[in-house]
Curated annotation (Swiss-Prot):
The gene is CYP71D181. Involved in the biosynthesis of phenolic monoterpenes natural products thymol and carvacrol which have a broad range of biological activities acting as antimicrobial compounds, insecticides, antioxidants and pharmaceutical agents. Catalyzes the C2-hydroxylation of gamma-terpinene and alpha-terpinene to produce carvacrol. Also mediates the C6-hydroxylation of (4S)-limonene and (4R)-limonene to form carveol. Residues 471-496 are annotated as: Disordered. It is an enzyme of class 1 (oxidoreductase). CDD domains: CYP71-like. PROSITE patterns: CYTOCHROME_P450. This is Cytochrome P450 71D181. It comes from Thymus vulgaris. Keywords: Heme, Iron, Membrane, Metal-binding, Monooxygenase, Oxidoreductase, Signal-anchor, Transmembrane, Transmembrane helix.
């Protein structure tokens, strides 16, 4: 048989199979589904995602078809929630029904078969690891005790910028190093030897864990599974991750003590691993998954938010001047302000909230509907993938005046906060799966940002204007800048 005829036959057989399966699944769907755009055979609405970041494309779909929209992406049924009302119903009223996560190739490979906290299903394992995390690492007492670590690492960062006065410097890189060091010292008792490599792996992994790989969207296809080249790339990344974490854990076993001279979170996990009364055994893979969680949610999100805040301030010089003036007035003479002092400064606090509104750390929050239910009058079938478009909600003109404009002053009139109570602004999620480290993360954003505004005057590289700034985002589960933020620091002279 001619090889071209063989390939045509294979394609026809595969297409026929998918068409049959799609019709079979469609016949089982309830009638009262959310509105949906016209779709194509085999691929459904997959073609609509081309040419843009998912959160941008999905915003356009929900603007046209309604805040709750139903999509068929390949053979996977998804529902997009893009309003505060629908999100509140899913994450508060029906929270247990929507507390699950769906699997992706990226999360399964890099997060140890979702044997972690971020990507874990809503089960006893998740409850156990979250309880340990909150009680042993993220309690209010512990977060306050980490203040001296922030001061140490902030002093190091200030020295780096002072040594580069008048010279363009990659602020993104230096801020990421600082954020990484703070989290490592707080969680693990010391800075990891390979933390730079680990941070790079986090960025790569988050870019491929969004669930939009073809193999994620056609889970029944062995052929697409076989031809998923990113799967092999992820496995190579996983091997590098194992090498780093196995080495770190071996060093940790033989060390005498950590930063505080006592147990850190890894010691606690090892101790509890030996406890026969655990509902779910704590495995070595689970410990490694937790460490990768800490890097994913702890270091990447804080660094990304500081970079976006500085980017928006550099693009809006009048806002930068206002923030610097207020910080310098309130912190005058205070070389090492604590979290409480910084959070009392109104305008920089509004700058952070406005940054999180425009640039949430995770633009799309993935959930899984456990059982059939109703949201804003529409039926959501069991096992439907849910995409909460936090990015779109933060830019909805129904809730925000001039929504695409960076304007921290809006919070003088709008008393919304970011801790999961106001569903118009949920950068850390909401409900029982809200980010447990949000207060730790906010402290790691607000204190460094205030210090950078206090100590330095900032300029763009020579010949560059605010209008020239590239504000593009990187594709993936998180939303960091596509290109690094380059700035020129000058030491602030209070007498000038």
């Amino acid at each position: 048989m001619d090889i071209s005829i063989l390939w045509v036959a294979i394609i026809l057989v595969i297409s026929s199979y998918f068409i049959f399966m799609n019709k079979w699944r469609a016949a089982k769907l309830p009638e009262n589904l959310p509105p949906s755009p016209p779709k194509l055979p085999v691929i459904g609405h997959l073609h609509l995602l081309r040419g843009g970041l998912p959160q941008h494309v999905l915003r356009g779909i929900t603007q046209k078809y309604g805040a709750v929209a139903h999509l068929q992406l390949g053979e996977v049924y998804s529902v997009v929630l893009s309003s505060a009302e629908s999100t509140k119903q899913a994450m508060k009223v029906l929270d247990p029904t929507f507390a699950d996560r769906f699997d992706s190739f990226g999360s399964q490979i890099m997060w140890y078969n979702n044997n972690d906290m971020i990507f874990s299903r809503y089960n006893d394992h998740w409850r156990q690891i979250r309880k340990i995390c909150v009680s042993e690492l993220l309690s209010p007492k512990n977060v306050r005790s980490f203040g001296f670590i922030r001061q140490d690492e902030m002093a190091r960062l200030i020295r780096v910028f002072e040594s580069s006065v008048g010279v363009p410097i990659n602020a993104s890189e230096e801020i990421s190093k600082m954020s990484c060091a703070i989290v490592c010292r707080a969680a693990f008792g010391s800075v990891l030897k390979d933390q730079g490599l680990l941070a790079d792996l986090v960025k790569e992994a988050l870019g491929m864990a969004s669930g939009f790989e073809l193999a994620d969207l056609y889970p029944s296809s062995w052929l697409l599974n076989l031809l998923c080249f990113n799967k092999y790339r992820l496995r190579r990344m996983r091997q590098r991750l194992d090498d780093i974490l196995d080495g770190f854990l071996e060093e940790h076993r033989v060390k005498k003590s950590g930063e505080f001279g006592g147990e850190d979170i890894i010691d606690v996990l090892y101790r509890m691993q030996k406890d026969s009364e655990n509902k779910v055994p704590i495995t070595n893979s689970g410990i490694k998954g937790f460490i990768f969680d800490v890097f994913s949610a702890g270091t990447e999100t804080s660094a990304t938010t500081i970079q976006w805040a500085l980017s928006e301030l550099m693009k809006n010089p009048e806002k930068l001047a206002k923030a610097q003036a207020e910080v310098r007035e309130k912190l005058k003479g205070k070389t090492n302000p604590d979290v409480a002092e910084v959070q009392e400064i109104k305008y920089p606090h509004s700058v952070v909230k406005e940054t999180l509104r425009l640039h949430p750390p995770f633009p799309l929050i993935p959930r899984l509907c456990k059982e059939e239910c109703e949201v804003t009058g529409y039926t959501i079938p069991a096992k439907t993938r849910i995409l909460v478009n936090v990015w779109s909600i933060g830019r909805d003109p129904a809730y925000w005046k001039d929504p695409d404009t960076f304007n921290p002053d809006r919070f003088d009139e709008v008393s919304r906060d970011v801790i999961g109570n106001d569903f118009e602004l949920i950068p850390f999620g909401a409900g029982r799966r809200i980010c447990p480290g949000l207060h730790f993360g906010l402290a790691n954003v607000e204190v460094p940002l205030a210090q950078l505004l206090y100590h330095f005057e900032w300029k763009l590289p020579q010949g560059m204007t605010p209008a020239d700034m590239d504000m593009s985002e990187t594709p993936g589960l998180s939303g960091p800048r596509k290109n690094p933020l380059i700035m020129v620091p000058t030491i602030h002279n209070p007498t000038s």
